[in-house]
């Protein structure tokens, strides 16, 4: 084997060709905007969507790739990463559909907004498969810094500027905390950077039992908990969600959160296998706090965006049940729930954007009587909210059933019962909005609904919103009825990933010893 063949085999760059497609798309958008100018806004969004969908198709052809490691082990393109990378790419696709009209109306550059969003997407996709400390941190910062820029993109809006500053300050602090935990891992392993090598070296040093490893675990979990909005690292979420542009909030609630969970699985299962019981205990506590606080505080909210912020905190708590179960069923149900959460949550945000574009408000009380003026929007928002609440036969019901069943099988009886109780609480504040929209008496309509403008889908940027809404509602409805194919996909991604199988077997052995 000559030198060039050896280098090519070690780099294995074909593993990241989905990301390569997005990089090319990003360059086309930047160059097209420079050459054509602001008139490019008529076609650039569709170029971005085409590139993202091409990347998803490329991910499909990467499935069951026998040679998953690339760049000297820095990136792992296994089936687990493929699913999470697809979730990030699809969330960006729907977010761009909902952004066109919103950004145009704000008077800011659409091309720059899409370019920043594609950069965040690249960060999230690389983070989903990162298998080395430097790769993890660079991907995390790529996602985070792009998110800060998008949060403050509406420069004329003081709330957007405030949200960006809060997000930047708290996000920078969490990155520093995470980096400190990662640096401890680097030192404990004797200078190793790939996760597999770190796990092997730590095992050989005092059997892996050291105060340094425990401290590293705490700092790393703090950084991850910030990214997934887990209590008590959630303080930024309500203010940032309320003040940020709504399409950005939609991306943060799905794409960024999915990348955070992908990081949690790969880093904790591989590098912290020796302290598995400890990090499972910590995530159990985080799940309890997130489910209780997220769903209880959401009851008192008057803003739709703020209500969905606390809802997303509660939803993160539900997903953590699958993580703490540490079984094939647990990881599969976790991935399945994130797949359906993608459509039901983004569908809800599309409805919020449509209502805000027509009325200029996101106050829950202003939705009163909406059914009489806009039945399509009422139907779409009702389906998405009821699915988030777990009402059968919508997708959210089956997602929660799978999560709770996986937790019950793993002996997490208290956690599952608490999940059921908080899920019932969440149904109340979702149904409250639905009930408000379908009031029949004209005198009960809000002022915003009484002055509701004529529905015109032929305005610039409205067709993409309509397409996004229809796709999200159909996916939310059908994913519940046809949940088996999606769950089989999630199961295949888990059973074909060696690190998860090793973790599950280790748990079974330790339980048998007890």
Curated annotation (Swiss-Prot):
A Pfam family recorded for this sequence: Proton_antipo_M
Top EC group: translocase
UniProt keyword annotations, A-Z: Membrane, NAD, NADP, Plastoquinone, Quinone, Thylakoid, Translocase, Transmembrane, Transmembrane helix, Transport
Membrane protein topology class: Multi-pass membrane protein
Stretches that traverse the bilayer: 16-36, 43-63, 80-100, 110-130, 133-153, 168-188, 211-231, 245-265, 279-299, 307-327, 335-355, 379-399, 411-431, 467-487
Molecular function as annotated in GO: NADH dehydrogenase (ubiquinone) activity; quinone binding
Record EC number: 7.1.1.-
Predominant subcellular localization, coarse grouping: membrane
Keyword Transport: yes
Stated role: NDH-1 shuttles electrons from an unknown electron donor, via FMN and iron-sulfur (Fe-S) centers, to quinones in the respiratory and/or the photosynthetic chain. The immediate electron acceptor for the enzyme in this species is believed to be plastoquinone. Couples the redox reaction to proton translocation, and thus conserves the redox energy in a proton gradient. Cyanobacterial NDH-1 also plays a role in inorganic carbon-concentration.
Protein family membership: Belongs to the complex I subunit 2 family.
HAMAP family reported in the protein's UniProt record: NDH1_NuoN_1
Oligomeric form and interacting partners: NDH-1 can be composed of about 15 different subunits; different subcomplexes with different compositions have been identified which probably have different functions.
Stated name of the protein: NAD(P)H-quinone oxidoreductase subunit 2
Originating species: Gloeothece citriformis (strain PCC 7424) (Cyanothece sp. (strain PCC 7424))
Gene that specifies this protein: ndhB
């Amino acid at each position: 084997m000559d030198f060039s063949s050896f280098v090519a085999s070690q780099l294995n760059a074909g593993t990241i060709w989905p990301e390569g497609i997005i990089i090319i798309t990003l360059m086309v958008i930047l160059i097209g905007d420079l050459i054509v100018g602001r008139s490019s806004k008529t076609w650039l969004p569709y170029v971005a969507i085409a590139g993202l969908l091409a990347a998803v198709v490329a991910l499909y052809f990467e499935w069951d790739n026998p040679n998953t490691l690339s760049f000297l082990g820095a990136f792992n393109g296994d089936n687990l990463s493929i699913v999470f990378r697809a979730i990030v790419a699809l969330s960006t696709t729907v977010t761009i559909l909902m952004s066109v009209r919103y950004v145009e109306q704000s008077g800011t550059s659409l091309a720059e907004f899409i370019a920043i969003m594609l950069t965040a997407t690249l960060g999230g996709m690389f983070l989903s498969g990162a298998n080395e400390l430097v790769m993890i941190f660079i991907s995390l910062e790529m996602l985070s810094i792009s998110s800060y820029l998008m949060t403050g993109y509406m420069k004329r809006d003081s709330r957007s500027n405030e949200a960006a500053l809060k997000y930047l300050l708290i996000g920078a602090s969490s990155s520093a905390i995470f980096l400190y935990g990662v640096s401890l891992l680097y030192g404990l392993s004797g200078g190793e950077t790939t996760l597999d090598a770190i796990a092997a070296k730590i095992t050989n040093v005092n059997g892996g039992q050291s105060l340094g490893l425990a401290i590293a675990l705490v700092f790393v979990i703090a950084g991850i908990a910030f990214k997934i909005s887990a209590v008590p690292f959630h303080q930024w979420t309500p203010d940032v969600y309320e003040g940020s542009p709504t399409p950005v909030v939609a991306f943060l609630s799905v794409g960024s959160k999915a990348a955070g969970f992908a990081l949690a699985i790969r880093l904790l299962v591989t590098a912290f296998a020796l302290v598995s019981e400890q990090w499972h205990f910590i995530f159990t506590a985080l799940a309890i706090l997130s489910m209780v606080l997220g769903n209880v505080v959401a009851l008192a909210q008057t803003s739709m965006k703020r209500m969905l912020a606390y809802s997303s905190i509660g939803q993160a708590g539900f997903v953590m049940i699958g993580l703490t179960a540490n079984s094939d069923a647990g990881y599969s149900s976790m991935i399945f729930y994130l797949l359906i959460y993608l459509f039901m949550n983004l569908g809800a945000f599309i409805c919020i954007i449509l209502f805000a574009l027509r009325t200029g408000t996101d106050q829950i009380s202003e939705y009163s009587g909406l059914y009489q003026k806009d039945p399509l929007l009422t139907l779409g928002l009702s389906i998405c909210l009821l699915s988030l609440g777990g009402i059968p036969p919508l997708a959210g019901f089956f997602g929660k059933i799978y999560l709770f069943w996986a937790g019950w099988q793993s002996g997490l009886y208290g956690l599952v019962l608490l999940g059921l109780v908080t899920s019932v609480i969440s149904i109340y504040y979702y149904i409250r909005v639905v009930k408000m929209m379908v009031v029949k008496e004209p005198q009960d309509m809000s002022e915003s609904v009484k002055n509701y403008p004529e529905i015109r889908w032929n305005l610039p940027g409205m067709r993409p919103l309509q397409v996004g809404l229809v796709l999200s509602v159909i996916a939310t409805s059908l994913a519940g009825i046809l949940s088996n194919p999606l769950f089989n996909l999630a199961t295949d991604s888990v059973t074909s990933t060696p690190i998860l199988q090793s973790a599950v077997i280790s748990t079974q052995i330790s339980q048998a010893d007890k």
